[in-house]
Amino acid sequence: SRNDTIESITIPYPLIIRPINSTKGEKEDIHICHTPGELRQSLNEQSHCENFILQEFVEKEYELDCIGVMTDQGMILPGAVLKHRHWPPLIGAGAYGLFTPVDDQNINFQGLETFLKQSGYHGPFSVEFLHKGDKNYFMEVNFRNEGLAYAATVAGANLHARYVDPSVKIDKVKPTYMMNYSLDFLYVKNGDLPLRTWLRDFLRTRCCINFSLRDPKPLAAHYYHKLFRRK
């Protein structure tokens, strides 16, 4: 908690601090701290979050966001988003990545299913890992619908339909690039990514997290309210 003494912490620096309960914190509550002074500064920042988890910071090669659903018939885990870019960088939401079949990612499938069965949870979920070398380092399980779950649908695995209708078949999924363009374009705006590189990635994207050509009205309504109904 904020009142604990940082001198008693035995985790080696650098470390990462994040809300222990994601529903009671924000992305802004996640910090990478290299010294006790930076940790104290992070804990002193104004926030609604009071309790945090501290972990050794792993210099990851990339993050994996495994997307699945737990049903009466067992766990269905078709694939994972290999995140190439986040916003804010390193610690933020997935902005651009590749949804790949789970068989390609060396995930402990049986261990994960056992964990979910023991938890008693049924419904959509996601599991996040850090990847470095030949290892996947467990981060967290989210017992909720994942923001990137639409990538699984576009790749051929409609998990929500399968959850409500066991007769829905999920065949082998295909690798699919996904992008949250409104976040990812900030890399270009900030000068961290050339426009030509971003356009290349955008053109090979088949899953825009916040836009669908088959259903454009939600996006149009979003920008209409943003532009013309400001208070």
Task: Describe the function of each predicted region.
Residues 1-53, 58-59, 70-74, 105-109:
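Active-site nucleotide/adenylate-binding loops and adjacent lid/helix of ATP-dependent enzymes
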Residues 15, 76, 137-140:
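Protein kinase-like catalytic core scaffold
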